Amino acid sequence: MQPLINRRQLIKGLAAGTVLSQLGPLPALASENKRLFVDGLCFLPDDLADLGASGIDAYLCDISAIEAMKQTDGTTNYKRTYQACIKSISAAKIRVEANSDKLILGLNANDINRAKQSDRTAVFFQIQGADCVEGSINNGLSQVDEFHAKGLRALQLTHHYGNQFSGGALDNDASGGLNLPLTQAGEALINKLNDNHILVDVSHSSPQAALDTARVSRSPIVQSHGAVRALVNHARCSPDEVIKAIADTGGLFGVFMMSFWLTNDKVPTVDHYINHLKHVANVGGIDAVAIANDYPLRGQKNLLKLNNNNAEGVKQYLSWWHSLREKNVLGYDIEPEHVVIPELNDIDRMNRIDLALSKAGFSSNDRDKIMGQNWQRVLSDVLV
């Protein structure tokens, strides 16, 4: 499939208005629950009752298993190794198939409609890092075929730091970042993923690697979860040229819930989240805007235990944050003061975002796209 270059127009004149910073329960939205809800990144919940409570019809489901590895510069990388991930995807597949009354293993976009019509949830298996297939670089990337056969439908090139395929967003040499490109092996991987109809995810990639991937891929690509660098100048946030390049492939950009990458203000609000969605729409067009979580369905677990006390909850991130500050990685010089937007660290977040979009002046048609139809379109274009 050829990239859909310049097929979107920038949206203009979004209606003005502020989103309420405090959102209570939303029973009024129950009658509007027919809107398709698709999330860009979440996990299989411990309690499957969370699926129905979330109102989500489908989501990219990270089934990664990781090994923590210390880097030579003292930071920690979390590698998705072949052995760990082949076990985790096998276990996830067994669990999904054993709970077919609640779950559908998403293999193509038609499974989204099947899930919605039967009050189930379609999960599309994703792995956050192509480290799991590095062992087959010299063997035609045959490990990609193994994972595809077990249900893998989206593969992220890397996670934070570069690997044999791609530069990572946090690669550094104490001078502010390396911005390493897609490698020759990375180009081969993109072609392999295109051939296997597996969605290419550039979340956590360096800007240059993301741009290279947009150029090389024959199918739409996505950043399933991320934020906007024009709003928060941080290495984990994407510059406008990356957002535009992703959109020009026919892909999309999902904005996630990690509030220290959504605002440097002391108190994170729903308005901050909506501002990122607006910016993606202005840069890439409304067809490129999507929702992502990157926490469990119920929300960030530790913050929920703390009743969303950000001052306490952020402490678990400080050691990691400070280690990257010492390496002069972009954005880590600013001390984080929060982890979540309390109103959205809730299992009802999709309804709350939908209402917030309405209050911000987004039309019903645009909300349809942002809340789920854009994901459905991209998965239809890529998966068979």
Q: Model regions: which residues?
A:
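N-terminal hydrophobic targeting/anchoring segments and the immediately downstream early-domain regions
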Residues: L4-I5, I11-G167, D171-G176, N233-I243, ...
